[in-house]
């Protein structure tokens, strides 16, 4: 058995697809009308459909998991993030961990937590 995909719930699937493409270069593989499979194993799921599947409320900014990306030139990434999405909500701005890794954390358009760090 292997882990195949990570699914996140989004309110506006097209805006989210554009967000992940703009910042991370992730492209669309398959559009299933409310469910988009992207490269890198990321799946975007329309919130209305997901609520219907589960019968439960969606909790934005639950901080219970994060999508983690590595970026060699994190300063250039932050410039791009601030230019393209100036109103993004940060959890922590650029910081350096005691082991030397530089990271930034922020929410995507739907409150899914993202971390971008330099390679370890």
Q: Can you describe what each PLM-predicted range is?
A:
Residues 27-61, 113-118:
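Conserved short beta-strand elements that form part of the metal-binding/catalytic scaffold
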Residues 11-13, 41-42, 47-48, 71-74, ...:
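Short loop segments at secondary-structure junctions
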Residues 3-11, 36, 56-120:
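Vicinal oxygen chelate
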């Amino acid at each position: 058995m292997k882990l195949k995909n990570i699914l996140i719930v989004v309110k506006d699937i097209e805006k989210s697809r554009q967000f992940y493409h703009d910042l991370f270069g992730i492209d669309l593989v398959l559009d299933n009308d409310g469910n988009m499979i992207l490269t890198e194993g990321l799946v975007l799921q329309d919130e209305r459909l997901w609520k219907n599947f589960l019968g439960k409320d969606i909790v934005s900014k639950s901080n219970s998991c994060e999508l983690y990306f590595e970026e060699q030139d994190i300063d250039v990434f932050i410039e791009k993030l601030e230019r393209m999405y100036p109103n993004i909500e940060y959890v922590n701005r650029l910081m350096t961990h005691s082991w030397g890794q530089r990271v930034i954390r922020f929410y995507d358009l739907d409150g899914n937590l993202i971390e971008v760090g330099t390679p370890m």
